[in-house]
Amino acid sequence: MTRILGIDPGSQRTGVGVIDVDEYGCSRHVYHAPLVLLGQSSFAGRLKQLLLGLSAVIEEYSPKEVAIEKVFMSKNADSALKLGQARGVAISAVVLRDLPVHEYAARQIKLAVVGRGGADKQQIQHMVGVMLNLQGRLQSDAADALAVAITHAHVSATAQRLGVSTKQAWSRK
C-alpha cells in the first residue's frame, strides 16, 4: 500500500488530499481539506501558516510520495508570484522530510481524472467523488488536491508496468 499526498497550492487556500493505493492500483480516500490561509495579516504569515499546516498533515498521515500541481501562468504577475512562493513553501515542507515530489500540469491532471484536458472544476469534483466513492460535493481546492494524488497514482502504476520513471510514463514520444 502506497500513501500519496496531493497538493493544490494557493496563496489564500491550499488543497490537500491523501489517498492510499494498493498493489492493483485501486485508490482509497484517507483525508482531504483546504488549508485556509486568510487569517494572517501578512503574506509572510500566510506562508508560515502553510508550512505549519502541511507539516502537520505530513506528520499525521505519513505519505510515501507527494504530488503537486505545477504553477500556471496568470495574467496577473503579482498573483503568479504569490502562487509560486506558496508552491515553493509547499515543496520545502515535503523535501525537508526527504519525500519524493512529483509535479503535474493542470491539463495533465484533468486528462488523467476526467479524460479531457479542458475539463472544468465541477467535472473534476464529480469524477474525484466517483473515483473515491465520496458522498456530497467536494470543496474545489481539496478536490483538486485529490485529483493530483489520483493522477500520480495512475502515472506511477503505468510507469511500474512499463519499467520506466514517472516522467517517462507521461511523456508522449
Curated annotation (Swiss-Prot):
Principal place of residence: cytoplasm
Stretch forming the signal peptide: none
EC number, as in UniProt: 3.1.21.10
One GO term of the biological process aspect: DNA repair
Gene3D superfamilies: Ribonuclease H-like superfamily/Ribonuclease H
Cellular compartment(s): Cytoplasm
Reactions catalysed: Endonucleolytic cleavage at a junction such as a reciprocal single-stranded crossover between two homologous DNA duplexes (Holliday junction)
Residues the record lists as binding Mg(2+) 2: E69
Keyword check for Cell cycle: no
GO cellular component, one term: cytoplasm
Oligomeric form and interacting partners: Homodimer which binds Holliday junction (HJ) DNA. The HJ becomes 2-fold symmetrical on binding to RuvC with unstacked arms; it has a different conformation from HJ DNA in complex with RuvA. In the full resolvosome a probable DNA-RuvA(4)-RuvB(12)-RuvC(2) complex forms which resolves the HJ.
Function: The RuvA-RuvB-RuvC complex processes Holliday junction (HJ) DNA during genetic recombination and DNA repair. Endonuclease that resolves HJ intermediates. Cleaves cruciform DNA by making single-stranded nicks across the HJ at symmetrical positions within the homologous arms, yielding a 5'-phosphate and a 3'-hydroxyl group; requires a central core of homology in the junction. The consensus cleavage sequence is 5'-(A/T)TT(C/G)-3'. Cleavage occurs on the 3'-side of the TT dinucleotide at the point of strand exchange.
Name of the protein in its database record: Crossover junction endodeoxyribonuclease RuvC
Gene behind the chain: ruvC
